[in-house]
């Protein structure tokens, strides 16, 4: 079987490994931010972001912790973690993007956007000419931040 990055982050593949990543973000990273910067991030000013396989992780974190992450930025999400049949409430605001030159990932982003919208979430789905890579995602990141935080 071919290894893929989704196996590191997706609750669909390895719940124990996902739980370790989840604990790191929810506990360790938040503790570090408090100690390093002297702030306690609030959900309305905090987003969780990922690209490709880590976009699946960002979506899972947003669904599981809307009290911590008020926004999700998911660029070119993979298909290992798909929208559950019943989405929790409340849902974080979600910005999804995928390139027209990566149809597999565009389909996954659209699947998530549709499911989240149907559940009443505030969702942006953007498709742009582009492919699966850092320059495409880096160009979109400032737009995500401006949408979520008005900057």
Where are these regions (language model features)?
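Non-catalytic cap/lid and distal C-terminal segments of serine-dependent acyl enzymes
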Residues: 1-151
